């Protein structure tokens, strides 16, 4: 389908994106019209989609979209939540008309109602979920393009792009790839440079998950402010008198100096109380009143150490 042109060949980075998003993973059931898009079947019963045929059908769908002169005549519909954000992003990038949410029956056939439209091309996310617009498109001869899984019915589908249309990552990546190829074929962006729009913008996000992330971010910001307010408070300023010279500003009081007599070693020895060896004191000295005056002169001691006799022999 790419005409053996190197420019239109699938790059390695595109294959890695397909594998990371799980685009090659089909369902456990297989429709007979989707049999030639299946590469093999895994041991757990999941069918593997041939990514080469996915890329070829993606280029064919992009050529069909580019062939419409007025981009507003291209109608993009997704009744499932996983594809509504991707559909809005695709319509914003390519200028198509979108119907996200519930499709009002009679939009393509009932000319009386205010929401009547006559598109020249119809794109849907899931042929099973979007069966009503496909049926009405068949009544008014509108060509249709659909993202089809292995178990999707191909009734009223003109161009089927085989891929995983159940996962929100796969659906977002397929709409991102289709929008990029449309812009490249129109000449809006160059093939030599990567597109500055990330595929993450096309992914569906649960509103509860967004609320939890916002709540966690708010709690983190409040905790950070409290922490900074507790530890980064400005220090208290104390007014100190300015003194030019410390020796002049501080008054030094005069203290009289007392003279003390030097104590000799003999007087210190005489003032010490006698100590008896072998005697144990069990009373508390601090509770007993002092009975002896230590400041008085010591009593005269006997000078006779040898007894009554002086005979040492």
Curated annotation (Swiss-Prot):
InterPro entries: Ribosomal_uS2 (IPR001865), Ribosomal_uS2_C (IPR032281), Ribosomal_uS2_CS (IPR018130), Ribosomal_uS2_euk (IPR027498), Ribosomal_uS2_euk/arc (IPR005707), Ribosomal_uS2_flav_dom_sf (IPR023591), Ribosomal_uS2_vert (IPR027504). CDD domains: RPS2. Residues 262-274 have a biased composition (Low complexity). It is found in: Cell membrane; Cytoplasm; Nucleus. Gene3D superfamilies: Glucose-6-phosphate isomerase like protein, domain 1 (3.40.50.10490). It holds the Pfam family 40S_SA_C. One of its GO terms (biological process) is translation. NCBIfam families: uS2_euk_arch. Belongs to the universal ribosomal protein uS2 family. This is Small ribosomal subunit protein uS2. It comes from Solea senegalensis. The gene is rpsa.
């Amino acid at each position: 389908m790419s005409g053996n042109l190197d420019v239109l060949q699938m790059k390695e980075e595109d294959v890695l994106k397909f594998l990371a998003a799980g685009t090659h993973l089909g369902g456990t059931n297989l429709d007979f019209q989707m049999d030639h898009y299946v590469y093999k079947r895994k041991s757990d019963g999941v069918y593997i989609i041939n990514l080469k045929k996915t890329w070829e059908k993606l280029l064919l769908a992009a050529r069909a979209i580019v062939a419409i002169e007025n981009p507003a005549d291209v109608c993009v519909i997704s009744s499932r939540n996983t594809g509504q954000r991707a559909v809005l992003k695709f319509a914003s990038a390519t200028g198509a008309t979108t119907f996200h949410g519930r499709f009002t029956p009679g939009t393509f056939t009932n000319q009386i109602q205010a929401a009547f439209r006559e598109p020249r091309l119809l794109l849907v996310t899931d042929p099973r979920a979007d069966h009503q617009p496909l049926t009405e498109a068949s009544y008014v001869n509108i060509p249709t393009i659909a993202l089809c899984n292995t178990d999707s019915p191909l009734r009223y589908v003109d161009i089927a792009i085989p891929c995983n249309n159940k996962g929100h990552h796969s659906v977002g990546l397929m709409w991102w790839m289709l929008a990029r190829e449309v812009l490249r074929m129109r000449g809006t962006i160059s093939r030599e440079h990567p597109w500055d729009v990330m595929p993450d913008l096309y992914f569906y996000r649960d509103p509860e998950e967004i609320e939890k992330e916002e709540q966690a971010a708010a709690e983190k910001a409040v905790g950070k402010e409290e922490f900074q307010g507790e530890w980064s408070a400005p220090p208290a300023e104390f007014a100190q008198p300015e003194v030019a010279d410390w020796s002049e500003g501080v008054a030094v009081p005069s203290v009289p100096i007392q003279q003390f007599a030097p104590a000799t070693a003999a007087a210190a020895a005489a003032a010490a109380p006698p100590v008896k060896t072998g005697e144990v004191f069990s009373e508390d000295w601090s509770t007993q009143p002092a009975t002896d005056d230590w400041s008085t002169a010591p009593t005269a001691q006997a000078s006779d150490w040898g007894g009554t006799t002086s005979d040492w022999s």
